[in-house]
Amino acid sequence: MKNLLFITWDGPQTSYMEGLFMPIFQEIAKTSDVKFHVLQFTWADENKISETKSAADKMGITYSALSILRKPNVSVGSLLTVLTSSNKIKNYIQENNIDVVMPRSTFPAMIVNKIKNRHFKIIFDADGLPIEERIDFSGLQKDSFQYKLMKSAETKMLKNADAVITRSQKAIGVHINNIGNENRNKFSVVFNGRDKNLFKLNSNSRVEARKELGLENEFLFVYAGSLGTQYCFPEMLEIFKNHTKANNSKFLILTGNTEFAEQKIPNELKSSVILKSVKSDEVPYYLNAGDAAFALRQPSFSMQGVAPIKLGEYLLCGLPVIASKGIGDTGDILKNFEECYLYDHSIGLQSQSKLIINFLEKAIFADKSRIADKAKDYFSLEAAADSYIKILNII
């Protein structure tokens, strides 16, 4: 049996660990002789940590949390945590006979880089293009000490790791440009998977959810996820507004940030928009009420490395999707989904409004079961697990 240690660095507001990674690890363990350990660096409170540990226990995963210092300020506290954690990780590796270490993203990579005389294999989860994402959305400057420190650590890990996993082929291209083509063979793309028994086409859920929402024959747009400047809320509202001019339509928004949505929705659309904040396991129920979904995101440089989780959730539920061009490998994947529309941000909405109207007219007749079946090849837990297993088998 291989003992694999996954090291991650997460804020308290994220649920990637219990919602994405641990279900994939559980699925891998069903068919592979691998025991998963998780060390999560976090500043979450005891309740959140307890919830995550409980989820891990149920999935047969050994979970521990390590605190991230937040004083004297966030940046210095994070650096101090990195500088003082390598011995803790080294001890854990020795005490638990760890064979493979999988650091996810920059800070865990920095910690593992500091371990000398290693006797374990490394699979580096490069996690998209996280440093470039900080440049695009958090104001990180390329000439700053922080950027140079993180980029140096990432480059060292990319070169030293036995294998590197990304979420897109485009991300591999970016990394190869950085470290050289001789390292290409160590790179692989892994999928983000969802439980196809939860995210699935369900006619009963559709009837019940539409009744609960007070819908009859209305065409229902749906969006599930975060809201903010990078998630193209104005474009969603404009597409919806255009559709209401000639159709009886509503827009269901499932988000934890309902306050943001309330502030941005124009008065003339408020009566046609339904805002809800629901638990993650309730999302598929409401998605089944929909007729088309939005998966829009600003296609900045860093977004080449992203695999949109929501896109998979929509497609597994059989929904036609309006998705952004230039986000990870979305364009290549959606070549197999003629029931979806690739939104080109470079030409703006007005230039493609007629194409979108035509797409939406056809969407109501889409074969949802066919969409859901095709989606399993890319977005199911089984597909995600298989993509990891291929790497574990050759490491």
Language model segments and positions:
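Membrane-proximal helix-turn-helix segments that form the acceptor-binding/catalytic region
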Residues: 86-91, 110-114, 124, 130-131, ...
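N-terminal subdomain of nucleotide-sugar transferases
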Residues: 1-53, 57-59, 96, 238-246
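Nucleotide-sugar-dependent
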Residues: 231, 277, 281-286, 293-313, ...
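Nucleotide-activated donor-binding/catalytic signature segment of Leloir-type glycosyltransferases, i.e.
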Residues: 255, 261-285, 292
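Carbohydrate-associated surface elements
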Residues: 170, 193
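A short helix/loop element that forms part of the nucleotide-sugar donor recognition site in Leloir-type
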Residues: 51-55, 200-214
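A charged, aromatic-enriched C-terminal amphipathic alpha-helix characteristic of glycosyltransferases
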Residues: 344-351, 361-393
